Amino acid sequence: MIEVKDILRRYTTGDIDLIALNAVSLKIEKGEFIAIMGPSGSGKTTFMNLIGCLDRMDGGTYFLNGQDVSNLEDNQLAHIRNKEIGFVFQAFNLLPRITVLKNVELPMVYGGVPPKERKERALSALEKVGLTDRVNHRPNEISGGQKQRVAIARAIVNNPAVIMADEPTGNLDTKSSIEIMKIFQKLNNEGATVVMVTHEDTIAQSAKRVVKFLDGEIIGDYVIKERKIF
Protein backbone atom coordinates (compact mmCIF):
# COMPACT_ATOMS: atom_id res chain seq x y z
CA MET A 1 0.00 0.00 0.00
CA ILE A 2 2.37 2.73 1.27
CA GLU A 3 6.10 2.18 1.63
CA VAL A 4 8.62 4.95 2.19
CA LYS A 5 12.33 4.34 2.65
CA ASP A 6 14.92 6.80 3.93
CA ILE A 7 12.88 9.84 2.91
CA LEU A 8 14.49 13.20 3.54
CA ARG A 9 12.93 16.66 3.56
CA ARG A 10 14.90 19.80 4.30
CA TYR A 11 14.07 23.50 4.18
CA THR A 12 16.69 26.21 3.73
CA THR A 13 16.18 29.76 4.97
CA GLY A 14 19.20 31.99 4.54
CA ASP A 15 22.09 30.20 6.23
CA ILE A 16 19.79 27.90 8.20
CA ASP A 17 19.28 24.34 6.95
CA LEU A 18 16.33 22.70 8.71
CA ILE A 19 15.85 18.96 8.35
CA ALA A 20 12.11 18.30 8.67
CA LEU A 21 12.36 14.55 7.97
CA ASN A 22 15.55 12.60 8.46
CA ALA A 23 15.81 9.20 6.72
CA VAL A 24 12.27 8.14 7.65
CA SER A 25 11.17 4.63 6.66
CA LEU A 26 7.65 3.26 7.17
CA LYS A 27 5.34 0.66 5.68
CA ILE A 28 1.55 0.90 5.83
CA GLU A 29 -0.50 -2.10 4.74
CA LYS A 30 -3.88 -2.03 3.05
CA GLY A 31 -6.73 -1.81 5.56
CA GLU A 32 -4.69 -0.29 8.39
CA PHE A 33 -5.86 2.63 10.53
CA ILE A 34 -2.81 4.59 11.66
CA ALA A 35 -2.55 7.63 13.92
CA ILE A 36 0.49 9.86 13.32
CA MET A 37 1.45 11.75 16.49
CA GLY A 38 4.12 14.14 17.70
CA PRO A 39 4.61 17.67 19.04
CA SER A 40 4.57 20.76 16.85
CA GLY A 41 7.58 20.72 14.53
CA SER A 42 8.12 16.98 14.89
CA GLY A 43 7.65 16.29 11.17
CA LYS A 44 4.24 14.62 11.25
CA THR A 45 2.50 17.11 8.95
CA THR A 46 5.49 17.20 6.59
CA PHE A 47 5.28 13.41 6.44
CA MET A 48 1.55 13.56 5.68
CA ASN A 49 2.15 16.12 2.92
CA LEU A 50 4.80 13.90 1.33
CA ILE A 51 2.79 10.68 1.33
CA GLY A 52 -0.22 12.71 0.17
CA CYS A 53 1.80 13.88 -2.86
CA LEU A 54 1.33 17.50 -1.79
CA ASP A 55 5.08 18.04 -1.37
CA ARG A 56 8.30 16.60 -2.77
CA MET A 57 11.02 14.77 -0.88
CA ASP A 58 14.70 15.63 -1.13
CA GLY A 59 15.80 12.02 -0.93
CA GLY A 60 14.55 8.47 -0.48
CA THR A 61 11.80 6.50 -2.21
CA TYR A 62 8.01 6.36 -1.97
CA PHE A 63 5.86 3.56 -3.36
CA LEU A 64 2.06 3.88 -3.40
CA ASN A 65 0.14 0.78 -4.43
CA GLY A 66 3.31 -0.62 -5.95
CA GLN A 67 4.04 2.49 -8.03
CA ASP A 68 7.17 4.56 -7.45
CA VAL A 69 5.89 8.12 -7.10
CA SER A 70 9.18 9.60 -5.84
CA ASN A 71 10.06 11.53 -9.01
CA LEU A 72 6.80 12.01 -10.88
CA GLU A 73 5.89 15.26 -12.67
CA ASP A 74 3.38 17.67 -11.12
CA ASN A 75 0.54 16.63 -13.44
CA GLN A 76 1.16 12.96 -12.63
CA LEU A 77 1.09 13.70 -8.90
CA ALA A 78 -2.15 15.65 -9.33
CA HIS A 79 -3.71 12.64 -11.06
CA ILE A 80 -2.62 10.34 -8.22
CA ARG A 81 -3.98 12.75 -5.59
CA ASN A 82 -7.37 12.82 -7.27
CA LYS A 83 -7.59 9.09 -7.96
CA GLU A 84 -5.74 7.36 -5.13
CA ILE A 85 -5.94 9.71 -2.12
CA GLY A 86 -8.88 11.20 -0.24
CA PHE A 87 -8.00 14.21 1.92
CA VAL A 88 -9.75 15.41 5.08
CA PHE A 89 -8.42 18.64 6.60
CA GLN A 90 -8.90 20.35 9.95
CA ALA A 91 -10.36 23.46 8.28
CA PHE A 92 -12.80 21.43 6.11
CA ASN A 93 -11.77 23.30 2.93
CA LEU A 94 -15.29 23.46 1.51
CA LEU A 95 -16.23 25.98 -1.18
CA PRO A 96 -18.72 28.37 0.48
CA ARG A 97 -20.74 29.40 -2.57
CA ILE A 98 -21.85 25.94 -3.70
CA THR A 99 -24.04 23.31 -2.08
CA VAL A 100 -22.99 20.31 -0.04
CA LEU A 101 -23.75 18.07 -3.00
CA LYS A 102 -21.64 20.14 -5.39
CA ASN A 103 -18.73 20.19 -2.93
CA VAL A 104 -18.74 16.40 -2.80
CA GLU A 105 -18.91 16.23 -6.61
CA LEU A 106 -15.74 18.33 -7.07
CA PRO A 107 -13.14 15.51 -7.23
CA MET A 108 -15.24 13.85 -9.94
CA VAL A 109 -15.49 17.10 -11.91
CA TYR A 110 -11.69 17.20 -12.05
CA GLY A 111 -11.70 13.52 -13.02
CA GLY A 112 -14.11 14.03 -15.93
CA VAL A 113 -16.95 11.91 -14.52
CA PRO A 114 -20.30 12.51 -16.31
CA PRO A 115 -22.85 14.67 -14.39
CA LYS A 116 -25.40 11.92 -13.76
CA GLU A 117 -22.78 9.56 -12.33
CA ARG A 118 -21.28 12.40 -10.28
CA LYS A 119 -24.60 13.06 -8.59
CA GLU A 120 -25.29 9.37 -7.90
CA ARG A 121 -21.86 8.79 -6.38
CA ALA A 122 -21.99 12.01 -4.35
CA LEU A 123 -25.38 11.07 -2.89
CA SER A 124 -24.06 7.61 -2.04
CA ALA A 125 -21.05 9.12 -0.24
CA LEU A 126 -23.28 11.55 1.67
CA GLU A 127 -25.50 8.65 2.69
CA LYS A 128 -22.46 6.91 4.20
CA VAL A 129 -21.82 9.92 6.44
CA GLY A 130 -25.49 10.49 7.27
CA LEU A 131 -26.03 13.78 5.45
CA THR A 132 -28.59 13.08 2.74
CA ASP A 133 -30.88 15.66 4.37
CA ARG A 134 -28.34 18.45 3.83
CA VAL A 135 -27.46 18.02 0.15
CA ASN A 136 -28.87 21.39 -0.93
CA HIS A 137 -27.48 23.38 2.00
CA ARG A 138 -24.40 25.57 1.72
CA PRO A 139 -21.46 25.21 4.13
CA ASN A 140 -22.49 28.26 6.19
CA GLU A 141 -25.86 26.61 6.85
CA ILE A 142 -24.49 23.51 8.58
CA SER A 143 -22.52 22.83 11.78
CA GLY A 144 -18.79 22.19 12.09
CA GLY A 145 -19.34 18.48 12.58
CA GLN A 146 -21.55 18.36 9.51
CA LYS A 147 -18.94 20.25 7.48
CA GLN A 148 -16.36 17.63 8.39
CA ARG A 149 -18.77 14.88 7.36
CA VAL A 150 -19.13 16.61 3.99
CA ALA A 151 -15.34 16.69 3.74
CA ILE A 152 -15.20 12.95 4.45
CA ALA A 153 -17.86 12.28 1.79
CA ARG A 154 -15.79 14.29 -0.68
CA ALA A 155 -12.69 12.30 0.32
CA ILE A 156 -14.30 8.90 -0.30
CA VAL A 157 -16.34 9.70 -3.41
CA ASN A 158 -13.60 8.49 -5.80
CA ASN A 159 -13.05 5.28 -3.80
CA PRO A 160 -9.42 6.21 -3.02
CA ALA A 161 -6.73 3.75 -2.01
CA VAL A 162 -6.13 5.69 1.20
CA ILE A 163 -7.88 8.35 3.27
CA MET A 164 -5.51 10.94 4.77
CA ALA A 165 -6.88 13.06 7.59
CA ASP A 166 -4.89 15.96 9.07
CA GLU A 167 -6.24 16.84 12.55
CA PRO A 168 -9.82 16.01 11.45
CA THR A 169 -11.28 16.73 14.91
CA GLY A 170 -9.11 19.76 15.69
CA ASN A 171 -11.92 22.29 15.20
CA LEU A 172 -14.72 20.17 16.68
CA ASP A 173 -16.34 19.73 20.08
CA THR A 174 -16.30 16.37 21.84
CA LYS A 175 -19.67 15.18 20.53
CA SER A 176 -18.82 16.03 16.91
CA SER A 177 -15.36 14.48 17.29
CA ILE A 178 -16.92 11.19 18.38
CA GLU A 179 -19.29 11.27 15.39
CA ILE A 180 -16.36 11.79 13.01
CA MET A 181 -14.31 8.98 14.55
CA LYS A 182 -17.30 6.64 14.31
CA ILE A 183 -17.34 7.31 10.57
CA PHE A 184 -13.60 6.70 10.19
CA GLN A 185 -13.85 3.45 12.13
CA LYS A 186 -16.81 2.34 10.02
CA LEU A 187 -14.96 3.13 6.78
CA ASN A 188 -11.90 1.27 8.05
CA ASN A 189 -14.04 -1.73 9.01
CA GLU A 190 -15.34 -1.72 5.43
CA GLY A 191 -11.76 -1.97 4.13
CA ALA A 192 -10.58 1.64 3.81
CA THR A 193 -6.98 2.47 4.71
CA VAL A 194 -6.87 5.50 7.02
CA VAL A 195 -3.82 7.60 7.94
CA MET A 196 -4.62 10.33 10.47
CA VAL A 197 -2.51 13.06 12.04
CA THR A 198 -3.68 13.99 15.54
CA HIS A 199 -2.30 15.47 18.75
CA GLU A 200 -5.15 14.06 20.86
CA ASP A 201 -4.43 10.82 22.71
CA THR A 202 -8.13 9.91 22.93
CA ILE A 203 -8.55 10.27 19.18
CA ALA A 204 -5.35 8.32 18.49
CA GLN A 205 -6.67 5.44 20.58
CA SER A 206 -9.43 4.94 18.01
CA ALA A 207 -6.82 3.85 15.46
CA LYS A 208 -5.22 0.42 15.27
CA ARG A 209 -1.60 1.59 15.23
CA VAL A 210 0.29 4.67 16.40
CA VAL A 211 3.44 6.11 14.82
CA LYS A 212 5.18 8.85 16.83
CA PHE A 213 7.47 11.51 15.39
CA LEU A 214 10.05 13.71 17.12
CA ASP A 215 12.62 16.00 15.49
CA GLY A 216 11.97 14.57 12.03
CA GLU A 217 12.38 10.95 13.03
CA ILE A 218 10.09 8.08 14.04
CA ILE A 219 10.60 7.34 17.73
CA GLY A 220 7.68 4.97 18.27
CA ASP A 221 5.59 2.53 16.24
CA TYR A 222 3.17 0.23 18.01
CA VAL A 223 -0.16 -1.56 17.70
CA ILE A 224 -2.92 -0.42 20.06
CA LYS A 225 -3.88 -3.36 22.25
CA GLU A 226 -6.99 -1.81 23.81
CA ARG A 227 -8.49 0.19 20.99
CA LYS A 228 -11.18 2.77 21.76
CA ILE A 229 -14.33 1.96 19.80
CA PHE A 230 -16.69 4.89 19.35
Label for each model-derived stretch:
Residues 1-213:
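ABC family nucleotide-binding domain
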Residues 209, 217-230:
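Conserved beta-strand-loop-alpha-helix hinge in the C-terminal portion
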